[in-house]
Amino acid sequence: MSTEIPDGICYNNITEINDFCEVIIMLNNVKNGSVKILPGVFRERMDVNRRYLMELDANCLLQNFYLEAGIILPGLQVVDDPTTANIHWGWEAPVCQLRGHFLGHWISAAAKLIASDGDAELKVKMDGIISELARCQELNGGEWVGSIPEKYFTRLINNQYIWSPQYVMHKTIMGLSDAYIYTGNTQALDILVHLSDWYIRWTGRAAETNPHAVYAGEEAGMLEVWAQLYQLTNDEKYLTLAKRYADAGLFRKLREGRDSLTNCHANASIPFTHGAARMYEITGDSDWLEVMKLFWKFAVTDRGMYSTTGMNAGEFWVPPHLQGHFIGSNDQEFCTVYNMVRTASFLLRYTGEKQYADYIERALYNGFLAQQNADTGMPTYFLPLAAGSRKKWGTKTRDFWCCHGTMVQAQTLYPEIIYYTDSERLIVSQYIPSRFEGEVSGHSVTFEQTTGMKYYNDQAFFDEKDDGQMSRWLLKFSVKCADNAKFTISFRVPEWTVGAPEIELNGEKITARVEDGYINITADWSDGTLQIFFPSELRMERLPDMPELGAVVDGPIVLAGLISADCGIKGADKLSEQFMPQLEHTYGTFPWRQNSWRTRNQPQSVMFRPLYEIRDEEYTVYFTGKDGE
């Protein structure tokens, strides 16, 4: 199915609406809708997510907005048996103070799928939901369009406890913004125009009576949405709102060089960086970019992380380099994975530094994929890393955790983080089967990448490889141009690459310069093919505070042992001698199944599989590694 999709908004030319000073952006996003995800594990995860979005009942998605607007749905005026009521439960239940948060995530995810896939059926459903939100807004007096009552914000001003009302409203605003950005739904923007008038008054009242209230109720995402709306409309009232949310204490502490994260709620702090990113884009003030870099320093560089990229336990930042002390059942909240990937993607665009793309790659496999059930699309709130763990999956209508919402968004993010451009290049940042159709250096280009992953032997493309070896990192690319066009294609060399990448251009082996972690190939393109092999090897990544414990990693992919306890690994300094590939798949049938391994030369033989393939099995990630045995 397909439908004509408007270009929407692309942030390639931010300086056009910036009246302050020049914004330096090293890498530009490609246009919405220019990237199509091709068959493979990422496409499969997008598809199961799309099925779930369509499966959910629109009335249930809107239930809390209806209740707030005084609309009673048939069958819900009197409920005799709650178990049979057609209603969403968990955090969406009408008695929960976070009720209604999920719909904003749903709208955002739907909008991005519509933009990337031209999904007409999903667009009809999304447009209908937005129309109903406009109806609710009218019944509420023309401004408020909340799933929660306005009085929750009065409680913030009065310093009375209430569970994160700004978090809830941020999701609604975010979803409506994305509906306008990605699909051109002007009704969504109209709703926001009127809702923002309510916020102008509320923040003004708060500033006069209790300025702290603006920074209460988990408000971290608010700065981004108001700054983004200023980008979209150039309406000064949104800039006013952005400025009212721009003086968070986190920013002051970061500028002072203080660790403002340790033992604090992780996901309540990460979205501040997204707001800083938008403020950098609308002001050009490099101080905002510096704040983002300082955040990354305290969150990642100086803190360390699990091999899966997790940096938190029980929702709180783990103290620097003490990850081993916090291994348990509540590691790596998924919301933090998603939001850190967004932070990394901003920093990648602004700086061009490869480290952020490497981080994103690892988070995709060990967060986005590992924390989504491949069958149902459901998330796991945390990613347990203790020995003998099992993932706890959410249900389709009875949980609706925060991570439930970020997961449906996460599975639509892939088209935005694979390709970038600058004035002369197409940059390939992630290796996900996909097709890009757009403009590079003034030329119309179609670029496609697929994986050559399969069992290969001495007849394989690289005949010097050992017999019986398997790799997913044999990558194939095709380039087609409307005319003969000279430009550069830059390919990220992953941080885990061992030795020199091996390259063929149009069937001929070539060498290419590597600069700042990228292979740069400049050619006169018309119709061309490329193949690149990134050599990798198994390695053990040890915990800084418990170096006796380590995770087995293959490229960017964390492996899990199918065992209920830490049985130890002898000879951990030479894992290639302790693990043998488990040739259990037919790669023509499962072209994106990652390698499985089985230990050898060990007291106990253990199967290892990618953590993202684990569903209901018991597993162990960190093992005692003994060198030289």
Indicate where each model-derived feature is located.
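A conserved hydrophobic secondary-structure block that centers on an alpha-helix together
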Residues: K151-L232
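C-terminal beta-rich recognition modules with glycine/proline-rich loops and embedded aromatic residues
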Residues: S34, A242, M292, A357-N366, ...
